[in-house]
A protein has these predicted regions:
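A secondary-structure boundary/capping signal
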Residues: 118, 150, 196, 238-239, ...
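Iron-sulfur-associated redox domains of electron-transfer enzymes in respiratory
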Residues: 1-73, 217-486
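Residues that cap or flank secondary-structure elements
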Residues: 122, 152, 198, 245-246, ...
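Iron-sulfur cluster-binding cysteine motifs and their immediate structural context
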Residues: 127-151, 159-196, 201, 205-220, ...
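Gly-rich Lys/Arg/Thr-decorated short loops/hinges at beta-loop-alpha junctions or inter-strand turns
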Residues: 111-117, 140-145, 187, 205, ...
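Ferredoxin-type iron-sulfur electron-transfer modules and their immediate structural context
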Residues: 1-163, 167-174, 451, 478-482, ...
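Short, glycine/acidic-rich beta->alpha junctions
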Residues: 156, 202, 323
Length: 486
């Protein structure tokens, strides 16, 4: 894997070790030793005060990987082995938690309360524009002439930062809050971050933004593995972006998944073909009825945004199901008694799956890589597995920005020339503001708007396995090999 930060290495390593213990039937018996083995005595503890703090962080980071969250802890003395036993019991008799994400309070470093700080670059100038312009009189001057900020009075308005002619005042971001486009993350009175589920759109931007790796998804890995071990039929439906995830042939990737124990593998691109045809017909129908524009509906993060933050956009969102929706029904039709597992790069698919009775579990590409490592499955040695059904190139193109738009236009052929299509390929604050304006005015720069939460599309999803640039390049190469088209 092309790790771009150490927090990815930590997640991968921890889940790999947990899967290894599970595979050896030692999860409950040996999990209590895992934090000690990962941070042995006298080991370096990067970013933590001591080895004991590091071990505590390993312990609590194990909870979401076991399918639990911080609310499940009622007694700090409860050992990991007890949580592991609960996780296995849930996998046998219960269902995954409804929570999608959680903040590991023990790992959260409680970043700065105030975002501005005056550095020693302050020249102690006569103008003192920082002090004069501060609306809360929070800027004071030392006897030396240098300015300083009273953090109890400061409201982080940034006026002093803009006023300083020497750029001596720096802005210190809180990375997770900075990454969140809908202000769903905020600190409590102790400085620990919390995710407001009523605002969160599950875009996953915070997941890799936190430099301490304190934000986790609630995993369903052990629920899936338990079903496979029991001998149940478990079918994997894999997102189109898998073409850009692993540096092996796609047949080897599917072969490795078969080796994990999946009954069958179905490409979500099959479902994308249904999405394309249905969405194309719906678009033409709505435009003929006089509707000014229609947006896509396949990105679950965008659907959450509309439901929670831009309800005025609802009439303009396509009613067509996502590729996962249709692929899950293809799987259920072929294997009525099977558990269906969607595998992709997306956090928000976990929320979509809660509303879809045909999808039982979600796994990410990142989790798949850890599972393969924990089970000691070498992808390059896996027996290649080929699909019996091949989807058109455009269906696989859903993985990249412009892919949905391009597929619909390709399907419509000559009719597409009359349609002006545009794309929104990153749900940041600016894009959300634009979408809100479209909904309010009922006017948009195009008649068909493709919306994806991730910059560049699903190929850059928060739970991707490959490095972004390499993944895009690999996807482009794989798409070029697929000759079938509309």
């Amino acid at each position: 894997m092309a790790f771009t930060s150490n927090i990815m290495i930590v997640r991968h390593r921890l889940l790999k070790e947990l899967v290894k213990l599970w595979n050896n039937n030692e999860l409950v018996d040996k999990i209590d030793r895992l934090p000690i083995e990962l941070s042995p005595k006298r080991s370096k503890h990067a970013g933590r005060c001591c080895v004991h703090k590091e071990r505590a962080v390993w312990k609590y980071k194990s909870l979401p990987l076991l399918g639990l969250d911080m609310e499940d802890e009622t007694d700090e003395l409860t050992p990991l082995s007890e949580y592991a036993a609960r996780a296995l019991d849930r996998a046998e008799n219960g269902r995954p938690k409804d929570n999608i994400m959680c903040v590991i309070d023990e790992a959260c470093s409680a970043c700065v309360q105030i975002n501005y700080e005056i550095t020693n670059l302050c020249r102690g100038c006569t103008a003192r524009s920082c002090q004069v312009n501060c609306p809360k009189k929070a800027v004071h001057v030392k006897e030396s002439g240098q300015a300083w900020i009273d953090h109890d009075a400061c409201i982080s308005c940034g006026i002093c930062h803009k006023s300083c002619p020497y750029h001596a005042i720096v802005y210190i971001p809180v990375p997770c809050e900075e990454a969140c486009p809908v202000k769903a993350i905020s600190k409590d009175e102790k400085g620990i971050e919390h995710i407001d589920e009523s605002k969160c759109i599950y875009c996953g931007k915070c997941l890799n933004a936190c430099p301490f790796g304190a934000i986790f998804e609630i995993s369903q890995v052990f629920d899936v593995l338990h079903r496979i071990r029991k001998g149940e039929q478990v079918v994997a439906i894999v997102a189109p972006s898998i073409l850009g995830q692993f540096k092996m042939t796609i047949e080897q990737v599917y072969g490795a998944l078969k080796q994990v124990g999946f009954t069958d593998i179905i490409e979500v691109a099959q479902g994308a073909m249904d999405t394309v045809s249905n969405e194309a017909h719906e678009l033409i129908e709505k435009l003929e009825e006089g509707q000014k524009f229609m947006t896509t509906s396949c990105c679950p993060s965008y659907i959450e945004l509309v439901n929670k933050h831009i309800p005025a956009m609802k009439p303009y969102v396509s009613d067509t199901g996502s590729p996962m929706y249709y692929a899950a029904r293809i799987a259920k039709e072929k294997y009525p008694d099977a558990k269906v597992v969607f595998i992709g790069p997306c956090v928000a698919k976990r929320k979509e799956a809660q509303r879809d009775e045909a999808v039982d579990f979600i796994m990410t590409f990142e989790e798949v890589a850890s599972v393969l490592a924990g089970l000691d499955i070498q992808m390059e040695q896996a027996k290649p597995y080929s699909m019996s059904f091949t989807s058109v190139r455009e269906a696989h193109g859903f993985a990249q920005a412009g892919g949905v738009m391009g597929a619909v236009k390709a399907y419509l052929k000559e009719e597409a020339d009359k349609i002006n299509a545009v794309q929104v390929a990153n749900l940041d604050k600016k894009a959300i503001g634009a979408l809100r304006a479209y909904a309010k005015s009922g006017k948009a720069p195009g008649q068909f708007i493709e919306v994806m939460a991730c910059e560049g599309g699903c190929i850059t999803g928060p739970c991707s396995h490959n490095e972004i640039t390499a993944g895009k390049r690999q996807l482009t190469q794989e798409l070029a090999k697929r000759k079938e088209t509309y």
